[in-house]
C-alpha cells in the first residue's frame, strides 16, 4: 500500500555525483587530493591540518572586495556580481568600506587628481590587502596613455597583484583574475603580505 513497495528500503540511494559526459566517469574521482581527503575522513572521521593552512583556506574563500570603478570597466565589474556570473559563489563578496575589504578592484582610467584618493583608500584597507587592476586603462593608461592628466597604470600608485587585460575585459576575465588571486594567496600561504 502506498508508494513504497514492501521489499524496498526507506533510505535514499547513494548519490552518484556528476558524471563527465566525455568519459562516463565521476568528476573528481581520480583527483589525488579528494581521494586522500575522503580516505582520511572515512578512517578517522575528522581532518588534521595546521593553523596556517586553515587560515589560508579561510582567506581564499572569504575575500571581500571594494570597487574603485572609474570608467566603463566598472560596468563589467558590476555584471560579474549579477546572477549570471555570481562571483559570490567563489567567496568574493562586495563591501562598501575599505576598512572591511581585502581586495580593491581598480577598474578604469586613473587620473592624476584621482591618484591621491586611490592611495588613501588603499592605505585604509587592513593587511593583508590585494589589488586587481582591471582593464587596459588601469593597467597602463589605455587609450589615454599620452594624455597629460592620466596616470600610466595604477601600479605607479599602489602595488598590483593581478592584472586583467582587455578594453573592457569581460566578466569572465575578471572571474579568472579572482581565481588567480585565490591561487596566489594559497601559494604564498602567509598571513602577512
From Swiss-Prot:
Coiled coil: none
Keywords from the named record: 4Fe-4S, Cell inner membrane, Cell membrane, Iron, Iron-sulfur, Membrane, Metal-binding, NAD, Quinone, Translocase, Transport, Ubiquinone
EC number: 7.1.1.-
GO cellular component annotations of the record: plasma membrane; respiratory chain complex I
BP GO annotations: aerobic respiration; electron transport coupled proton transport
Membrane protein topology class: Peripheral membrane protein
Annotated family: Belongs to the complex I 20 kDa subunit family.
Subunit structure: NDH-1 is composed of 14 different subunits. Subunits NuoB, C, D, E, F, and G constitute the peripheral sector of the complex.
Domain of life: Bacteria
The keyword Iron-sulfur appears for this protein: yes
UniProt main location, coarse: membrane
Record: residues binding [4Fe-4S] cluster: 72-73, 137, 167
Pfam families referenced in this protein's UniProt entry, alphabetically: Oxidored_q6
Places the protein is found: Cell inner membrane
Function of the protein: NDH-1 shuttles electrons from NADH, via FMN and iron-sulfur (Fe-S) centers, to quinones in the respiratory chain. The immediate electron acceptor for the enzyme in this species is believed to be ubiquinone. Couples the redox reaction to proton translocation (for every two electrons transferred, four hydrogen ions are translocated across the cytoplasmic membrane), and thus conserves the redox energy in a proton gradient.
Cofactor(s) required, per the database record: [4Fe-4S] cluster
Chemical reaction(s) catalysed: a quinone + NADH + 5 H(+)(in) = a quinol + NAD(+) + 4 H(+)(out)
Enzyme class: translocase
GO molecular function, one term: quinone binding
Name used for this protein in its record: NADH-quinone oxidoreductase subunit B
InterPro entries referenced in this protein's UniProt entry, alphabetically: NADH_UbQ_OxRdtase-like_20kDa (IPR006137), NADH_UQ_OxRdtase_20Kd_su (IPR006138)
Cofactor note: Binds 1 [4Fe-4S] cluster.
Amino acid at each position: 500500500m502506498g508508494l513504497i513497495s514492501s521489499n524496498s528500503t526507506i533510505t535514499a540511494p547513494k548519490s552518484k555525483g556528476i558524471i563527465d559526459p566525455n568519459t562516463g566517469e565521476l568528476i573528481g574521482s581520480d583527483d589525488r587530493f579528494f581521494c586522500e581527503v575522503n580516505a582520511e575522513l572515512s578512517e578517522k572521521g575528522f581532518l588534521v591540518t595546521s593553523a596556517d593552512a586553515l587560515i589560508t583556506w579561510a582567506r581564499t574563500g572569504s575575500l571581500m572586495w571594494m570597487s574603485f570603478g572609474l570608467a566603463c570597466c566598472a560596468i563589467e565589474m558590476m555584471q560579474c556580481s549579477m546572477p549570471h556570473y555570481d562571483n559570490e559563489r567563489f567567496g568574493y563578496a562586495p563591501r562598501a568600506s575599505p576598512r572591511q575589504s581585502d581586495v580593491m578592484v581598480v577598474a578604469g582610467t586613473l587620473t592624476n587628481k584621482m591618484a591621491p584618493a586611490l592611495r588613501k583608500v588603499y592605505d585604509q584597507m587592513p593587511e593583508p590587502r590585494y589589488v586587481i587592476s582591471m582593464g587596459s586603462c588601469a593597467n597602463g593608461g589605455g587609450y589615454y596613455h599620452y594624455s597629460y592628466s592620466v596616470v600610466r597604470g595604477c601600479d605607479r600608485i599602489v602595488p598590483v597583484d593581478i592584472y586583467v587585460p582587455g578594453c573592457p575585459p569581460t566578466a569572465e576575465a575578471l572571474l579568472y583574475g579572482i581565481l588567480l588571486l585565490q591561487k596566489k594567496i594559497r601559494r604564498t600561504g602567509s598571513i602577512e603580505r
